[in-house]
Amino acid sequence: MKRETFGSRLGFILVSAGCAVGIGNVWKFPYMCGQFGGAAFILIYLVFLLIMGIPVMVCEFGVGRASRHSVAAAYETLEPKGTKWHITKWIGVIGCYFLMMFYTTVGGWMLYYCVRSFRGDFVGADMKTVSAGFSDMLGNMPLMAFWTILISIIGFGVCAFGIQKGIEKVSKFMMTALLLIMIVLAIHSVMMKGAGAGIRFYLIPDFKQMAEIGIGNVIFGAMSRAFFTLSIGIGAMLIFGSYMEKDQRLFGEAVNITVLDTIVALMAGFIIIPACFAYGIEPGAGPSLIFITIPNIFAQVAGGCVWGGLFFLFLSFAAFTTLVAVFENIISFDMDLFGWSRKKSTLVSLILIIILSMPCVMGFNVLAGFTPLGEGSTIMDLEDFIVSNNLLPLGSLGYVLFCTKKNGWGWNHFLEEINQGEGWKFPSGIKGYMSYGLPLLIIIIYLKGYYDKFQPMGTKVLVGWMIVAILFLTFVIGCSCGKSNAEKVDK
């Protein structure tokens, strides 16, 4: 069966950017930027995007375009016979499922709050009322299940139409609308009375604050955010590489996608931070920022139901473009592994994702007593930990090693593939960095993530979990150490 391709270069860029643009751009980046020193943090963040995020993305795109498969079959297609690289494909397969087990729930929240905002539910409400409304939603399992199932059905429905007629067409519209809505919201926010203090907090370099937090913490914060913002590591980008033509070099395409993702993150800050300062509300991070702080602000603004509705519409688009991208990856797994048709793969995957999403939904109500990562944690926290702290960095490490090691795809084959076509050429002189420096950075992010997560729980807990982290790391490195049959014969 002939491989589908994108209808246009713009379609590929917007679909891939839609996958990269996610909720973290909104509920994490602006707060981190203000907290870690404003413009100085942004500069460090951009450096790490260039030296770490973009190279990993190029690796994913390259493996996808060369193999013409999802991660479920990409390694088998390119690896030398006798090697074990294909075992690491399960990082991508499992990663996409685990990501959707909680991201569908979050997407459902966005859709529900979009409807509530346009309906005027928050007009005139105080902080206590808004906060109680969020708690009531979390405690209402049927309501949460409904919105989770609805957004899953819509997402898989789009994927059922294929790349050009479904995903590309919808993502073009949603990403364009998302950017336009963000521009309108940002202009409205920065023009609020008192917004200037927020803009200064957001952008002006505060080296004194950086020194108080610790330069090392600021650098690691920027490095981590740059790594996690691009949805790299679980094959979500690889699948779109497999639908690409060979008329464009992949380095330039990765830069374009990263620029779009960064624009969205920066604009989110212009929407949120000035508005918080204008109304004297402490800007925070995470779900409380989105579902309590922001509705409370729009409750006080003239025309708040419109502005609030637009805000949650843009968030719904951001969540939905990511959902559709990962759904396509999941559908492709079945098509590659079992030879199923797109229609059958879509239906089976939809049913499976709905079932797998229910533990996350129930983790806030029926299963609220289950705290897998310590007091106050939820099933969503566990699923997020599995994806963000494990599968994303381990999967990324696997791609980089595969593209640079002689017993993998190899540096020469990698360069030959990614430099086909027009556009910016990937520098061949950084082989040493790609082979040793970049893997080391990824390993540092991975182990530091474990340390930060479990260090507050005490030495015994920390040591136990660090052993687990090292075992997972050993698994990936072990898969990269096998010799090909050709090497064995030569020996």
Model regions: which residues?
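Membrane-embedded translocation segments of transport machinery
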Residues: K2-F6, E168, K172-F320, V324, ...
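C-terminal membrane-solvent junction of multi-pass transporters and transport-like membrane proteins
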Residues: T88-I91, G95, F338-L350, F385-Y446, ...
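Inter-helical loop and helix-membrane interface segments of multi-pass membrane transporters/permeases
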Residues: R3-E4, M32-F36, A66-I91, T104-Q164, ...
